[in-house]
Amino acid sequence: MAEGGTGPDGRAGPGPAGPNLKEWLREQFCDHPLEHCDDTRLHDAAYVGDLQTLRNLLQEESYRSRINEKSVWCCGWLPCTPLRIAATAGHGNCVDFLIRKGAEVDLVDVKGQTALYVAVVNGHLESTEILLEAGADPNGSRHHRSTPVYHASRVGRDDILKALIRYGADVDVNHHLTPDTRPPFSRRLTSLVVCPLYISAAYHNLQCFRLLLQAGANPDFNCNGPVNTQEFYRGSPGCVMDAVLRHGCEAAFVSLLVEFGANLNLVKWESLGPEARGRRKMDPEALQVFKEARSIPRTLLSLCRVAVRRALGKYRLHLVPSLPLPDPIKKFLLYE
């Protein structure tokens, strides 16, 4: 069996059959030469949640200088920082201690994942809140295709989603799009799947769906934004309302979209036929709610609320409680 050669960067590639992949990953992605990465006690302690060992090690300057070092550890394959490891395991006390000792909260691993993102993915609310309070970017990193908001919306963790929103997460954000309309090497979107509002509906997570809308999520996302829906795959939903109906979501999803000002004319009547109903049977009550809403003009009260919220913009909705208005009107504007 031939030995592995060298890669384009001059580093040795994987060796013969059955190569030690962990060692190869360490060689490729660790922050320091291999001879300096043999001592993984700091990373191992973060993995098992051994706070006392972390305290002891970080009393020494040699370990304090390595607090942001990416390295493999006892049970890990991809080189990560101690904070990233502790966040993955959900050791909130270790996460807090490492941050207070100088760990950088927004460093990314080789996949572009931040400590906050992996805390959310693994469902650790305490670690999520500690990282957010320490200033972690609630939107994650542009180097990764997903976001904390998107994942929380997909799995129905409304408690984590509330925390992300409270710390200013963008409820429409997705890292597939850039400010440029046609950025070089960008991938054009051909579906709604990158939209947090859409994914919460696709998985029938009503509470997350409501939270996103209350926080200012665009009910017509991808229809009046930077995406050309004409390039969507034939038969795929062109707007969130269309997707809600096709996925067989209950009537409450439709009612919320109507209440938050969705453009009902974006759904084509011909798209509601049996051949366009998708994998699930369309909810007859939801379809009836949609048809009734489309046939009856919205009330002036409803239109005013939508107009005021749009004028404020999603980034200023949190200021509504400070407006010089009666409490009932504030609650009305916030859909409380």
UniProtKB/Swiss-Prot annotation:
Signal peptide start-end: none
Tissue expression: Highest expression in testis, spleen, bone marrow and salivary gland.
Coiled coil stretches, renumbered: none
Matches recorded under SMART domains: ANK, SOCS_box
Ranges: ANK repeats: 37-69, 78-107, 111-140, 144-173, 192-221, 236-266
Entry note about domains: The SOCS box domain mediates the interaction with the Elongin BC complex, an adapter module in different E3 ubiquitin-protein ligase complexes.
UniProt function note: Probable substrate-recognition component of a SCF-like ECS (Elongin-Cullin-SOCS-box protein) E3 ligase complex which mediates the ubiquitination and subsequent proteasomal degradation of target proteins. Mediates Notch-induced ubiquitination and degradation of TCF3/E2A and JAK2. May play a role in testis development.
Protein's recorded name: Ankyrin repeat and SOCS box protein 1
